[in-house]
């Protein structure tokens, strides 16, 4: 099975940690795993890029502004069309939006999986124009999720949040796991 994960950056956070564990499990099952990164990593934060490269994961970096770059859309479309992935798995709102826009024009019907890693608009302050635009964007994005093959939430709380955005979505809960064997924070 050929899978492409799409994510905003590889700076380690919750979504990126989950992605790394998921990719390691997929590699153990001998899947052909690729990662498309929309934006650049912040040099002041830890990146999981070296861990992915060490495991032989093909990484494509678009290196443009994370969402509003026409060339990034064209490059991602070309990659998806040429590679003919069985699954395209997006991991954050910007990634979801780009995959939604591009997938409509792909000749092969790859399955699109969306992972929702948190309640994205709930940390915003009220009243700010930019925050109101983000909330509007999330409501619109939840309508785009209807065309996904599967929507995965990390918790029941996130599932409820998604369903409040769009009651027509069928959301599956798959909680994060902790890889104790590879964790430095746990003692055996």
What residue spans do the PLM features occupy?
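Membrane-interface segments of envelope glycosyltransferases acting on lipid-linked substrates or membrane lipids
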Residues: 1-188
